[in-house]
Amino acid sequence: MARPRLIAPSRTLLFVESHPSSPHLAVPSTFPAPSRLAPSGVRSGVAGGLNPENRIAYQGEPGANSDAACREMFPELEPLPCPTFEDAFDAVETGLADLAMIPVDNSIAGRVADIHRLLPESGLHIVGEHFLPIHFQLMALPGTRLEDIRAVRSHIHALGQCRQILREHDWAPAIADDTAGAAREVAELADPTVAAFSPRLAAELYGLQILLEDVEDEHDNTTRFLVLAREPRDFSLHAGPMISTFVFRVRNVPAALYKAMGGFATNGVNMTKLESYQLGGTFFATQFYADVEGHPKDTALALALEELAFFSVHLKMLGTYPASPYRAQIAEPAENRQLRPTHQGNEV
């Protein structure tokens, strides 16, 4: 049987939000106005101390994983869909939204492209984090049977994370701009031979039927989101664990990075993330992005940052915020220490 020809994603809808104090300021979007349906099956990780009021911006269409993350962490806010990450950043900078929910890492796909570049340039501050388990549902028009399906639409990363079921059923993968957008396109096509891999929320929003649940290859797939605001929050009285995020560039001398990192080791500060990326399309200007445990006012972290600054030509704090409770679930087991090399029965 011949494969159906799939049309390009539809871009006919328009959603324009105007700032009440600036009638000429608007953020155009091809997405419909966000719904207030509650999500199901998402993991909580609320950062205390925030006092959001109106809207939270995210990149993607209504029903996307970023939409679900917004609804889970801030159910009192109105999700504001934005076509691009830049638009989501701009919505906060211009006052169209109080916060933005931006994905930064995925446990399978790795870091989200461009965020490490956009975040330092934006002038926004990280004020929270959220971990969302990523599950994809096979959805189609109501009444569709599995044997009717010939092709499945989704974002390229989602298709890559659902390879097994695609091979089992010999379904043709079709790339869409967005996982939620794939569900919308299936509803618009009204073709029972075309289905979508999308979040559960998308089926509710676009009136689709879920045929198979959690079809992803790896069920521990998780995305970490950062919550951004125009101004930093004061978490000095927060009693729980904190995370501090910053970017830096070291001096172009031998062992500069090694020496810059030494302060974290000698002061007992745990670094949970360290990544490098090139600046400005060059191969000689490298910037590092880091997450560490603690608050800059803590003596240990203050000393470590002081030593880092000595060996750096640039150091910028992006935010200090409460650690998500989910971190306690993914903490390294104590028994892993037994895997370290030993000498005559003693740890070395």
Q: Where is each model-derived feature located?
A:
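Domain-level signature for soluble enzymes in the chorismate/prephenate branch of the shikimate pathway
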Residues: 2-348
